[in-house]
Regions:
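Short runs within selected transmembrane alpha-helices of multi-pass transporters and secretion channels
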Residues: 23-29, 33, 48-94, 101-125
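Specific pore-lining/lateral-gate transmembrane helices of multi-pass inner-membrane transport
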Residues: 1-39
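Residue-level recognition of short, structured coil/turn motifs
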Residues: 39-40, 101, 128
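Interhelical loop/hinge segments that connect adjacent transmembrane helices in multipass membrane
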Residues: 1-4, 126-135
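Juxtamembrane helix-entry segments on the extracytoplasmic side of multipass membrane proteins
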Residues: 41-49
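Conserved short cytoplasmic inter-helical helices of the MFS fold
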Residues: 1, 42, 74-78
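Helix-boundary and loop/linker segments of multi-pass membrane transporters
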Residues: 38-42, 72, 97
Length: 135
């Protein structure tokens, strides 16, 4: 039943949203401390860097969740298309700016944003197609 599947995917994305907000807040508050404890003070990075990495990580969770939905619809080609366009964004985006960390972090965010945007369009079309085919 595609309606049930759609509701489950929405529940998953809602969970990722709640988890993501909590994770971003946690990284903003304790990210520096956690890296200092885990890797030593020589590997400490700024709060800004932790927040940007957390944002890209949550974006990746969205992308992987929606990809699973497309795979369930047997839409591997659409999934691959979204990932290829997203990955192609990385080298273009990383070429702007001076600060290497900031360039990589922003490029990661743009990469997952483009990927999630395309995956979202493709999964929405897939749900609409299934609804039309069902009737």
């Amino acid at each position: 039943d595609y309606e049930k599947f759609k509701n489950e995917l929405i529940r998953l994305l809602s969970f990722v949203t709640v988890f993501g907000v909590c994770f971003i807040v946690l990284m903003g508050v304790a990210g520096q401390w956690a890296t200092r404890i885990a890797f030593g003070s020589e590997y400490e990075i700024s709060t800004r860097n932790m927040l940007l990495l957390a944002i890209s990580s949550i974006g990746l969770m969205y992308a992987l969740s929606i990809t699973q939905g497309l795979l369930a619809f047997h839409r591997q080609g659409l999934s691959a298309t979204a990932w290829i366009f997203g990955i192609a964004t990385f080298p273009v985006t990383i070429s702007f700016g001076e600060d290497l960390f900031l360039r990589v972090e922003v490029a990661l965010i743009f990469t997952v944003f483009i990927t999630v945007l395309l995956l979202g369009v493709f999964i929405t079309k897939s749900f609409k197609t299934q609804r039309v085919n069902k009737t």
